[in-house]
């Protein structure tokens, strides 16, 4: 199994069990999340409650909770929303921190295409939920979630060049 870590913090952000599609000249990965129910346990112990005088559905309240699979699996932490000015400030710092960690070929491609990816993200800024990895580091890479038109499940966007592939 492959895990993708934040190159700046080492936080696990994604794995190969979630399929991605490259967009914006390979700058961003688009990943479909899913709402799932966590904690709902339906245990059949083989008893017949009606024959034993028991009521329907007696027992423990198992506190089922709906969560988004990617957020839950990688313990992503939601961040306050950014306005355009805050996002541009973040991007300047992010580019400054990430560029030295890339090899020469990656740096060239990153510098060539990051402006287009930034404009794409800015065009959707009001629709995003913002997440970072578990450590919530100041220099952490952002993960963006939004709902496509009519979608019931969120779509996540990752900065491809900020992910480091690790075999588990």
Curated annotation (Swiss-Prot):
Record flagged with keyword Cytoplasm: yes
UniProt entry keywords in alphabetical sequence: Calcium, Cytoplasm
GO cellular component: cytoplasm
InterPro entries: Mss4-like_sf (IPR011057), Mss4/transl-control_tumour (IPR011323), TCTP (IPR034737), Translation_control_tumour_CS (IPR018103), Translational_control_tumour_p (IPR018105)
Subcellular location per the Swiss-Prot or TrEMBL entry: Cytoplasm
Domain TCTP per the UniProt entry, residue ranges: 1-168
Entry superkingdom: Eukaryota
GO molecular function: calcium ion binding
Pfam family, one: TCTP
Annotated function: Involved in calcium binding and microtubule stabilization.
Family from the record: Belongs to the TCTP family.
Protein name according to UniProt: Translationally-controlled tumor protein homolog
Source organism (scientific name): Glycine max
